[in-house]
């Protein structure tokens, strides 16, 4: 689950991570009052008005502005709220700005990078630091890997003091800045673990001329599987930032991710779903979605899956690929048949069922009288999908 920058900073503050003073605003008037409060507290200077969307690259897209007065904050907020911000992470459709973060200005000396996430290749959390703050870390890793340090964190020992010091040394910090950075890194790791995060990224991490080490920006993602331990975090979810179809699918316990292809996919199991998408691509098609109906698939979830897939106007064919281990193929077949009767399925449907009760399921499909195309094996299914696309 993703959250906004201001929400992430509030959580980090609770774990002792140093973040700027900030006030969230949902209107231009609230932004004006927030700027007035902050400017009074800091005795003038500048404050920053930041658009709050679930995407990076806001600064380059005009979503981060420096202002020197409350009236200027009002003008900037008026321009931002309600507009669509397009960045390299939003896609061409962009995201509508509905809230702002008004934050104290910083006297910046250095911009650095700090992040903690799971390294799936080593099955360990990894601490990453770079002297290239404000840059896309993927770009730094590709073009100047010598400027990025990765430190593997032992799963039972956790982040050790010497590792935090190693990271601070790599960043070229000394004296009070070094001490503050070590404390910051340790506090961020503590927050990452106790909040069950999948990502805690500070970009940029800034060092001020006064020696403060502070999170100028913060991106926090949670492990959805651990949210049952953090009921208060669930309320932070902003569904307006998510794809409406993905939100609708989650209500039926369906794992759905919308893509830009023309072949709808309904599969049980994430691994099989990814393999199915690869086969479609290799056969010449393009998957329109990732949809995992899970091990508890039943006629109702299958029908809901069809309804969600068909909401995408780009879908020209649907592939149902089920391997019946936990889920029984006849239950899935029943859902396919009911969906075909109750929903206007106006595109070809190719069905491949293997495993538990596959013979019964195939008989059900054959006797249904519906125009469903059966496939034997995944390669055959992908081939028939593309034949259907060619004939459309």
UniProtKB/Swiss-Prot annotation:
Role played: Succinyl-CoA synthetase functions in the citric acid cycle (TCA), coupling the hydrolysis of succinyl-CoA to the synthesis of either ATP or GTP and thus represents the only step of substrate-level phosphorylation in the TCA. The beta subunit provides nucleotide specificity of the enzyme and binds the substrate succinate, while the binding sites for coenzyme A and phosphate are found in the alpha subunit.
Cofactor descriptive note: Binds 1 Mg(2+) ion per subunit.
Family membership noted in the UniProt record: Belongs to the succinate/malate CoA ligase beta subunit family.
Protein name stated in the entry: Succinate--CoA ligase [ADP-forming] subunit beta
InterPro entries attached to this UniProt entry: ATP-grasp (IPR011761), ATP-grasp_succ-CoA_synth-type (IPR013650), ATP_grasp_subdomain_1 (IPR013815), Succ-CoA_synthase_bsu_CS (IPR017866), SUCC_ACL_C (IPR005811), Succ_CoA_ligase-like_bsu (IPR005809), Succinyl-CoA_synth-like (IPR016102)
Organism: Chloroherpeton thalassium (strain ATCC 35110 / GB-78)
Alphabetical list of HAMAP family matching this protein: Succ_CoA_beta (MF_00558)
PROSITE patterns xrefs: ATP_GRASP (PS50975), SUCCINYL_COA_LIG_3 (PS01217)
Molecular-function annotations in GO: ATP binding; magnesium ion binding; succinate-CoA ligase (ADP-forming) activity; succinate-CoA ligase (GDP-forming) activity
């Amino acid at each position: 689950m993703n959250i906004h920058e201001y929400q992430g900073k509030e959580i980090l503050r609770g774990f002792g991570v140093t973040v700027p003073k900030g006030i969230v605003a949902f209107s231009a008037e609230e932004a004006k009052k927030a700027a007035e409060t902050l400017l009074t507290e800091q005795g003038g200077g500048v404050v920053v008005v930041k658009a709050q969307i679930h995407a990076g690259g806001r600064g380059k897209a005009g979503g981060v502005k420096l202002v020197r007065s409350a009236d200027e904050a009002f003008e900037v907020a008026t321009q931002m709220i309600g507009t669509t911000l397009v960045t390299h992470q939003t896609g061409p459709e962009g995201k509508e700005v509905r809230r702002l973060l008004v934050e104290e200005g910083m006297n910046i000396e250095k911009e650095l990078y700090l992040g903690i996430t799971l390294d799936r290749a080593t099955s360990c959390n990894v601490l990453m630091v770079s002297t290239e703050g404000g840059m896309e870390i993927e770009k730094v890793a590709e073009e100047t890997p010598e400027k990025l340090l990765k430190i593997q964190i032992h799963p039972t020992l956790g982040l050790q003091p010497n590792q935090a010091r190693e990271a601070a040394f790599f960043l070229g910090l000394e004296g009070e800045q070094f001490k503050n950075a070590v404390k910051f890194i340790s506090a961020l790791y503590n927050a990452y673990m106790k909040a069950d995060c999948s990502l805690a990224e500070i970009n940029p991490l800034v060092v001020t001329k006064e020696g403060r080490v502070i999170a100028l920006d913060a991106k926090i993602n949670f492990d959805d599987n651990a949210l049952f331990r953090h009921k208060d975090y669930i309320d932070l979810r902003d569904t307006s930032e998510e794809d409406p179809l993905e939100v609708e699918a989650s209500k039926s316990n369906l794992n759905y991710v919308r893509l830009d292809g023309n072949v709808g996919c309904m599969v049980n199991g994430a691994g099989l779903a990814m393999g199915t998408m690869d086969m479609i691509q290799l056969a010449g098609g393009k998957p329109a979605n990732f949809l995992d109906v899970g091990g508890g698939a039943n006629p109702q979830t299958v029908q809901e899956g069809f309804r969600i897939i068909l909401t995408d106007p780009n879908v020209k064919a649907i592939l149902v690929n089920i391997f019946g281990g936990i889920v029984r193929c006849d239950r899935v077949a029943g859902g396919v048949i009911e969906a075909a009767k109750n929903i206007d399925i106006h595109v070809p449907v190719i069905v491949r069922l293997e495993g538990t009760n596959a013979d019964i399921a195939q008989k059900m499909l054959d006797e249904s009288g519906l125009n469903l195309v059966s496939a034997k094996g995944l390669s055959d299914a992908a081939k028939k999908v593309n034949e259907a696309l060619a004939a459309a």
